[in-house]
């Protein structure tokens, strides 16, 4: 693989799926920061578009039905897509389709990641499809509640079907060309489900860090965070895990003390909002949990402000006399480092301000759509991270009921309806036993989301790959000399799996079966 291409292999969408409150904002910014850092690093190489260099990808628009399940509703919207045809061998070559998730897609979506990296080997056409209601693919009427009912994973998959048919006509793609879907995080789930629901149209899929099991109370997230903080393989330790608990206990003590202690805490931890009310205290504690969880989720990724090893060093007073530091001081320093890296002044806001922001129907043209993704968590997935398990090192204050209240406050959706929606999602897609073949599920055991994915093969044609010490979508990140042997082997396995699939596709082409 050429050096310049390796530098462009940034994560396709490294945002968190955690769809609530301050945690959502912080993890979203962490993911965007990492992606932007990797893109700017590639640009810093001084790459030009001279002879032999990559051509700029093309952007296009597809007219899609707003409600394809209602034959009497002919309303439509424009869905953005990107195309990289630099390596395409023509009509019979494979199509690598990168599916967008809960954010906007730019030209980098077809210039980096698995599809672009693997395209030269097989002469593939690389296409990315932006998810409805995100980025610039927002229907008329914007983000009003009446419109959001047309936002769902099922409708997104219907868009994939119609896009495949329309793009085949537009680019004169042979009916025998195999279409292979790629995606990371929520988009990884979409990639797996596209193969599950439409095997006659999607030949195979690579699903990276795909949380295919919806869950209301996602306490398992912090179970993985706790284990990772103790993992010596990534710089954790029992001492580090204990220090996190001590630091959070000190934060809660100061919150209970009120007065000067609470005022000092607000300043030291950059809480932009009053801390007198329990709901605002939960916002701060949730943001602190997200900060530590984000360090674990993105551990080892280029551009991440802190690694687990570095965080543990801060909490344990590394680099100096430990008696001159406390876990709370280390946590405060971690907050400063992360906020500085993100160019952000506030770690948390008041609950009232958070609700007001999420009620805004003004579309976000870049990054993650917070209102849209919250709606999808309320109507399909849940994913509400809690700390009710005794093994959790954080605070129990950001409890599930207070999180579910946000669905009611913003969208008027009851806790019961959210629970029912989560159950329906698992019933429709099959949860962690989807039953799809020709799907490769790729996960890292450090990533808190891997517990919602498929990590054990359910059959000979439903493969899994678990990368030791791997974080969220790490297999999609830029190749580096410091990559672990398990990550290098994982990428080789992805290449080999794709090679096997495309050999099968070629044999089917010869037999006229594709």
Swiss-Prot record:
Keywords: Cytoplasmic vesicle, Glycoprotein, Hydrolase, Protease, Serine protease, Signal. It comes from the Eukaryota. GO terms for cellular component: endosome; lysosome. It is an enzyme of class 3 (hydrolase). GO terms for molecular function: dipeptidyl-peptidase activity; serine-type exopeptidase activity; serine-type peptidase activity. Glycans are attached at residues 70, 172, 321. Its EC number is 3.4.-.-. Expressed predominantly in cortical thymic epithelial cells. It is found in: Cytoplasmic vesicle. Gene3D superfamilies: alpha/beta hydrolase, Serine carboxypeptidase S28, SKS domain. GO terms for biological process: protein catabolic process; proteolysis. Residues 1-24 form the signal peptide. The active site is at 185 (charge relay system), 447 (charge relay system), 472 (charge relay system). Protease that may play a role in T-cell development. Belongs to the peptidase S28 family. This is Thymus-specific serine protease. The gene is PRSS16.
